[in-house]
Amino acid sequence: MIDQTAIIHDTAVVHESAVIGKGVEIGPFSVIGAEVEIGDNTWVSSHVVIKGPTKIGRGNKIFQHTSIGEDCQDKKYAGERTFLEIGDNNVFRENCTVHRGTIQDQSLTRIGSGNLFMVNVHVAHDCIIGDNCIFANNATLAGHVVIGDFVIFGGLSAIHQFGRVGSHAFVGGCAALNKDVPPYVMAAGNYAKPFGVNSEGLRRRGYTPEAISAVKRAYKEIFRSGKTIEEVLPVLTEMAQAEPAIQLYVDFLKDNERGIIRA
């Protein structure tokens, strides 16, 4: 179904089963496949390929030569029915690639809202990405990666499959992540190491000076006390009773399986 207000170039190919919302624009030579749903006021440039099953929300911008919803690159994939979901108001610049999930996980790749994917960013199968993140040019996410909210990835950075990055973390350019990065942490290097708290990012997002100070104290407990994760969790849990921002650390570390980056 194509809404009558949608603007579709004569050279674009749209499958009869696709659902195209109000005010959608689809540029020349783009291909919209079967079982694709594009939300209202989304703009699709020229030479874009979107395959289903894929659901895209409202107000997204998808630039030329981007591939959305393609089969994954996992060698175990054998044509199973898997999915991709994208929220609202995301920007995918030129040459981005986003793959659907696999049955070995939840059969789903999911991207939240308000994210910016710069040129050549790759999001592999089964990735889960939160809201308001920025991925600079050539950032690469392997399969099954989980990214929180307000995370920034520098250009040419990469993360190992099944890796996790907590909310408000900052990953420097050319970083290679082979372990998890807890919330609020700045990570850089190959392999990446922690370099303090993303204080500037927290200030921009309205964190109080008191909250930022508490986050820094928690950071020292995690990375400078010499304690294991099991030993530091009770300390952080107690700190979180006085400062709710610390709860992000607690929740993240409780779910840790791969280990976290270390100095």
UniProtKB/Swiss-Prot annotation:
Highest taxon in the source lineage: Bacteria
InterPro entries: Acetyltransf_C (IPR029098), Acetyltransf_C_sf (IPR037157), Hexapep (IPR001451), Lipid_A_LpxA (IPR010137), Trimer_LpxA-like_sf (IPR011004)
Pathway in which this enzyme or protein is active: Glycolipid biosynthesis; lipid IV(A) biosynthesis; lipid IV(A) from (3R)-3-hydroxytetradecanoyl-[acyl-carrier-protein] and UDP-N-acetyl-alpha-D-glucosamine: step 1/6
Membrane spanning stretches: none
Top-level class of the enzyme under EC nomenclature: transferase
Alphabetical list of Pfam families matching this protein: Acetyltransf_11, Hexapep
Gene3D superfamilies given in the database record: Hexapeptide repeat proteins, Udp N-acetylglucosamine O-acyltransferase, C-terminal domain
GO biological process entries: lipid A biosynthetic process
SUPFAM superfamilies linked: Trimeric LpxA-like enzymes
Localization in the cell: Cytoplasm
Keyword Cell cycle: no
Keywords from the named record: Acyltransferase, Cytoplasm, Lipid A biosynthesis, Lipid biosynthesis, Lipid metabolism, Repeat, Transferase
Single annotated GO MF: acyl-[acyl-carrier-protein]-UDP-N-acetylglucosamine O-acyltransferase activity
Gene Ontology CC: cytoplasm; membrane
NCBIfam families on file: lipid_A_lpxA, PRK05289.1
UniProt record similarity statement: Belongs to the transferase hexapeptide repeat family. LpxA subfamily.
Subunit description: Homotrimer.
Its biological purpose: Involved in the biosynthesis of lipid A, a phosphorylated glycolipid that anchors the lipopolysaccharide to the outer membrane of the cell.
Descriptive protein name: Acyl-[acyl-carrier-protein]--UDP-N-acetylglucosamine O-acyltransferase
Organism (species): Aeromonas hydrophila subsp. hydrophila (strain ATCC 7966 / DSM 30187 / BCRC 13018 / CCUG 14551 / JCM 1027 / KCTC 2358 / NCIMB 9240 / NCTC 8049)
Name of the gene this protein is made from: lpxA
